[in-house]
């Protein structure tokens, strides 16, 4: 159960980062790429709807597993994310469906999450939790908090190449700045209390954006290493995968949460379980 909670914490952190960090386009060292990025950035800012499919292979190791007699464990996380009204936080809706398979686990771990009408709903592993979330405030707070980050400091090693009719921009995200950035975003979003992220470290982040002839970002590829240290034990992860954007610019219908009354309020849930377990079991 403890290791599984760790996995869920990772998934929650990744999901939070994915949902809270909009795909931003950054300036490039070369004039060609800078011009291309300018176009992509304008398109991204105007995007109101998104239907994305993520597929990541994850290799997990570290002393926590070694103590259990396991050298490493392979996982695969597949996600579908649907969002609309992205430029209007008051109206915004999103839905995430994630399916995780791992060595030694016969059943996949399924998670679905929804945001609608100021509430965030999570349904996973037999638990249904809801919490109020003010996306307008989070968006503003995140914007303000991340103003101090200089894009030139955050990204480096730009390359530009062709792939069929598409163009690809590759770049590296600076480790220290990214760790700072994630802490800042999660803190601004009020999510740092949910998960203790002090022991989180992300490194060797390599990214590629695939841009179609119309200037749409149609795929993002990412490799990274991540470790979480908690109570003196470390779990390490190597991730490699991509996020594809289906029909960029087209309207997306986002499913609504079914039976919202069946979800328990996060505060009540944490109160009950913290007393029982002596620690936060969720995420």
Which stretches of residues belong to each language-model region?
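Sec-dependent N-terminal signal peptides of Gram-positive bacterial secreted proteins and lipoproteins
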Residues: 5-27
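Subset-of-secretome marker
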Residues: 27-283
